[in-house]
Amino acid sequence: MDSISTAILLLILALICLLLTTSSKGKGRLPPGPRALPFLGNLLQLRSQDMLTSLTKLSKEFGAVYTVYLGPRRVVVLSGYQAVKEALVDQAEEFSGRGDYPAFFNFTKGNGIAFSNGDRWKALRKYSLQILRNFGMGKRTIEERILEEGHFLLEELRKTQGKPFDPTFVVSRSVSNIICSVIFGSRFDYDDDRLLTIIHLINENFQIMSSPWGEMYNIFPNLLDWVPGPHRRLFKNYGRMKNLIARSVREHQASLDPNSPRDFIDCFLTKMAQEKQDPLSHFFMDTLLMTTHNLLFGGTETVGTTLRHAFRLLMKYPEVQVRVQEEIDRVVGRERLPTVEDRAEMPYTDAVIHEVQRFADIIPMSLPHRVTRDTNFRGFTIPRGTDVITLLNTVHYDPSQFLKPKEFNPEHFLDANMSFKKSPAFMPFSAGRRLCLGEALARMELFLYLTAILQSFSLQPLGAPEDIDLTPLSSGLGNVPRPYQLCVRAR
């Protein structure tokens, strides 16, 4: 192709992009925002190294609701508790769609529970929630599994004999085993290759998606498919995870008894068989594989990452750690492990866990939503199909909701009588129709794991508490904690 033809082609592409970015003007008044360039959108005003800060800065200029173009894709951004609550809670149905997120969607193709839409999403979510509840989510049966796994974790911590270690894989193996036992029917030994592979693939992909490479891939996926970089490992890892899950599914198929389902996979396979003759069924092999992947990812990374943040915070603020231990000793003692029933008598511990989740803010921007119809919102018109990013970080750090949002302060969740106090601006699991499916399980795990560990051990940093750096290693999809080591000393 000669230079003139190339120039003409580029001009045509630029005009198409310009038309796409301006085609909404006839559909009502979009929220304001910075002027966008063809193809690039607002890329020059955003820093891929710190997308969250860039988007938050724009909200100070254009308000709590504004429009930005991530490449050629139009996105409405919501900032602050009030705007996010009005969208996700007050207008839950309109904002219930799942927006474009190529780093996930190009793998799931809309077949998993996290990235499906419409009737498929509703069917998968309803049935998956039913299965999880049948296998004890939020009930005593799942609590018993967590307590059992807690015993194994405590034994692993004792083996460190007070020497420095990185808690990442020690914690992740235990946490992942909870969701694995629900999905696959049994827990793994801590040295099982399948468990170690699951954790490695999930941790690496979470770090890549939270990096500048992950941010850029979500803006220009078709372009970056041809560019070398760490983002290329995303889909290799996805493929390995899919093969691992498929292997387990084949094992389940060979021994399936529809009248006695052992786990999530058995239940899903039974549903597939029941609807095999229905060409419109949403239950087929790809939805099983992708939904299983979504549950493994959420059930492993969310709690594991939160606990790693919690350990650092408790070491940096040892007075908080001591106060939690005193409450554990007073309410539970040392003769048994804490249970969920104890939480009601432990307001300070409950407040600390909530404050860890607020302060660590492990999913600062949430996954994108999408409006399901033309939507009137705060005097603006958001066209159907528009993606919406909710800056959950600005909810958790909203000064109208938290007295000292930039400080780690458990009293954000305590009233004047030192009783636990809920906050409507507490949204670590998002809010509305896309609320995290495993919220109840995650909350139970965080309480039982943290109290069991602090009942038996004190967490000690390798240096001075004031030298602990709480800034994340990267901040994109998630706030990834920096690698660190600690010592656990038996109490």
From Swiss-Prot:
One cellular-component annotation, GO: endoplasmic reticulum membrane
InterPro entries: Cyt_P450, Cyt_P450_CS, Cyt_P450_CYP2_fam, Cyt_P450_E_grp-I, Cyt_P450_sf, Cytochrome_P450_fam2
Reaction(s) catalysed by this chain's protein: an organic molecule + reduced [NADPH--hemoprotein reductase] + O2 = an alcohol + oxidized [NADPH--hemoprotein reductase] + H2O + H(+)
Cofactor: heme
A GO molecular function held by the record: oxidoreductase activity, acting on paired donors, with incorporation or reduction of molecular oxygen, reduced flavin or flavoprotein as one donor, and incorporation of one atom of oxygen
Entry keyword Heme: yes
Keyword line: Endoplasmic reticulum, Heme, Iron, Membrane, Metal-binding, Microsome, Monooxygenase, Oxidoreductase
EC nos: 1.14.14.1
PROSITE patterns registered for this protein in UniProt: CYTOCHROME_P450 (PS00086)
Broad EC category: oxidoreductase
Main localization, broad class: endoplasmic reticulum
Topology term for the membrane: Peripheral membrane protein
Binding site for heme: 436
Entry superkingdom: Eukaryota
Compartment annotation: Endoplasmic reticulum membrane; Microsome membrane
GO annotation terms (biological process): epoxygenase P450 pathway; xenobiotic metabolic process
Keyword Endoplasmic reticulum attributed: yes
Tissue-specificity statement: Lung specific.
Disulphide-bonded residues: none
Biological role stated in the UniProt entry: Bioactivates 3-methylindole (3MI) by dehydrogenation to the putative electrophile 3-methylene-indolenine. Stereoselectively catalyzes the formation of the 1R,2S-oxide from naphthalene. Lack activity with other common P450 substrates including 7-ethoxycoumarin.
Family affiliation: Belongs to the cytochrome P450 family.
Protein name as catalogued: Cytochrome P450 2F3
Gene: CYP2F3
